[in-house]
């Protein structure tokens, strides 16, 4: 089974296991109109890609279109806050993660929502690893060589992340600190 097919299967299985496929058992018909899945990161991000795969199958299961809306900003906080303030009618939900529901609560002095009281978890859809990758012409073939290269080229290296305050940004900052290097300039999302 190829990776995309396996990923799609796991995402759909998680959604079905969460009860989304059991709409006939609900007291009222739902959904009767399209449902919006807010992705708190830019189009093309890992979260966006996952949401698009998941929404296609959810649309089939629910019998209504699941529309993706990318609302990025503040490490995902902007999109999540939008859903926190939306009418509690079940027609808008957010695809978030550790960065949007745990990190932001401690990273910002005044987060725009309370993860513990404004939201209820529905399903674990995917677990995602962060990878350290570089161009194949970088003269480093392992982590030890990468650290040595980064130390020898302080301030000259850059990394890409999902944006300031995102999980990938904080992971890079932690890596910088652990390695004692200055790899900077998070690239802005599209």
Protein language model annotation of sequence segments:
Residues 3-9:
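N-terminal export leaders
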Residues 10-21:
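Bacterial N-terminal signal peptides
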Residues 21-27:
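Sec/Tat signal peptide C-region and signal peptidase I cleavage site
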Residues 33-42, 66-67, 92, 120, ...:
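Short, well-ordered beta-strand elements
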Residues 37-50, 72-74, 161-166:
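Extracytoplasmic "Venus flytrap"
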Residues 47-63, 169-177:
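Short, polar/charged alpha-helical segment
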Residues 85-91, 106-190:
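Hinge/capping helix and adjacent helix->loop/strand transition within the periplasmic-binding protein
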């Amino acid at each position: 089974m190829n990776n995309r097919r396996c990923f799609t299967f796991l995402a759909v299985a998680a959604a079905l296991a969460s009860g989304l496929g059991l709409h006939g058992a609900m007291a009222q018909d739902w959904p009767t109109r399209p449902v919006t899945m807010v992705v708190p990161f830019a189009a093309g991000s890992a979260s966006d890609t996952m949401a698009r795969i998941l929404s296609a199958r959810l649309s089939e299961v629910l019998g209504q279109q699941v529309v993706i809306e990318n609302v990025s900003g503040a490490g995902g906080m902007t999109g999540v806050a939008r859903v926190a303030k939306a009418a509690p009618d079940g027609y808008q939900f957010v695809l978030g993660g550790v960065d949007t529901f745990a990190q932001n609560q401690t990273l910002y002095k005044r987060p725009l929502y309370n993860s513990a009281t404004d939201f209820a978890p529905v399903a674990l859809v995917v677990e995602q690893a962060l990878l350290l990758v570089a161009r194949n012409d970088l003269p480093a073939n392992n982590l030890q060589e990468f650290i040595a290269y980064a130390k020898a080229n302080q301030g000259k290296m850059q990394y890409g992340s999902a944006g300031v305050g995102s999980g990938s940004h904080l992971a890079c900052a932690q890596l910088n600190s652990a390695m004692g290097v200055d790899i900077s300039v998070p690239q802005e999302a599209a």
